[in-house]
């Protein structure tokens, strides 16, 4: 299969590309190299919204915490303020995560900064909602960043990553067609990593996966989601691995992984959860229990 390496804007999207080695010895570059290596048995760990069990989600403190525990990828969410500032926020409103109220798109950045972030239990803290720029300054050279809910802001995100010199350590995912992604990436001389999301038991997901397979495209990785493990799911995963791509799975909640989720691992035997995901071929796992997952993987020699 032709290798789709979008990290350094290898275009056209559907053509063959040459892998580029990381230019420095920093930790983020080493993680990027791991993502580019389908033969590696190490499992890349992504932390969902950072260490939100101990700090407000998508906060600088939550980012620093997961960097400290050895997480490989920080997943964060983006929204655009009324005055066009990209901030870290999952919801359309700031009601749940801050002391304020209202839709992000209706509020200026200065107004949002006057609010404080809340913990997952709704307790107010002294932390403030960071901008994308602030978050990337913290992450630079230290951890790969998965910008979730970010494809619609692609040009704005890329402008920030290029200015900060971190484009090569940013991953964006989506459900767009190969042609749509190719057209977007053709607009820029350099691009971020891109990974398709495949809801394999849904018609749209089946169609997107079939499109990649029929065109002979092997992206760096596929994110595969399923609510029940079936022969179709197994076949999809086997094709991903055989085709030379990484397999990203989510252990966040049961409907994304057929019940092999973080709560099951925390309340039971991690080997019966994370172990099964690894045995299915997963080499990238997004989790809400990064410490538990890393501990298990290290016990099997699958994480540094």
Model-derived features with residue positions:
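Phosphate-group recognition and catalysis centered on beta-loop-alpha active-site segments
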Residues: 17-304
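Bacterial Sec-dependent N-terminal signal peptides
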Residues: 1-27
